[in-house]
Amino acid sequence: MGKKLLEVKDLHTSFFTANGEVKSVNGVSYYIDEHEIVAVVGESGCGKSVTQMSVMQLVQSPPGKIKSGEVLLEDKNLLEYGPRSKEMQAVRGAQIAMIFQEPMTSLDPVYTVGNQLCEVIRKHRKCTKKEAWQIGVQALADVGIPDPESRMKNYPFEMSGGMRQRAMIATAVACQSKLIICDEPTTALDVTTQAQVMEVLQSLVDKFGTSLLIVTHNLGLVTRYADRIYVMYAGRIVESGTTEEIITKP
């Protein structure tokens, strides 16, 4: 494993409702090394997704609030930046990318996949439209989409669920993100497509040295791919270790 890429220290995130404070993330700490695949697993509602939204500073405020903690990306505390700051916007996409559960809600249905991909590429890589198009085509090819040139001209509704998810992964590849946070990336897909998407994610680590953080409730899915696993329950990390330790000696 490489050096530490991301470290979260004692993170606290709460939601303030009419019935009082709900501590969704309650003192969570974890780390990810370079070129490593780490999984955060837990039941629905345990706070695993809110933890990653806090890392990206995407928690809606109000009612949510990141109360305390540190999110260190290569020793820089991201929580010192405002959610709308130029520094944080530069981190999102270029250094940390996030792939959500349902790609149809992440892709705009009225723009082609190519237009959306090129917009992100031009923002983070400062290139011409022609260069961005070529980078986008190569990114689609890298994630296993056949005939990427024509697929760039497709609208999201013209692609299958697995193909749309690959297009979202291609966005992270095109931006050369150091870390990809995958929030339930295969839940909305059938079993065969789940395996294909996971193989694509695995290939990113092997080919580009990307680090992956996989958030899921499916322990069986990550046992094949993850180097280490964190188990969350009720807003806390209750167990951590290598995949072998978690599976054989919980």
Whereabouts are the PLM-identified features?
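Helical segment within the ABC ATPase nucleotide-binding domain
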Residues: 195-208, 220
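Conserved ABC ATPase "signature" region
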Residues: 76-77, 131-150
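ABC ATPase NBD Q-loop/coupling interface
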Residues: 16, 70-90, 199, 245-246
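A short, surface-exposed alpha-helical micro-motif characterized by mixed small hydrophobic
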Residues: 222-224
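ABC ATPase "signature
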Residues: 240-241, 249
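A short, proline-enriched helix->beta-strand linker immediately N-terminal to the Walker B motif
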Residues: 174-178
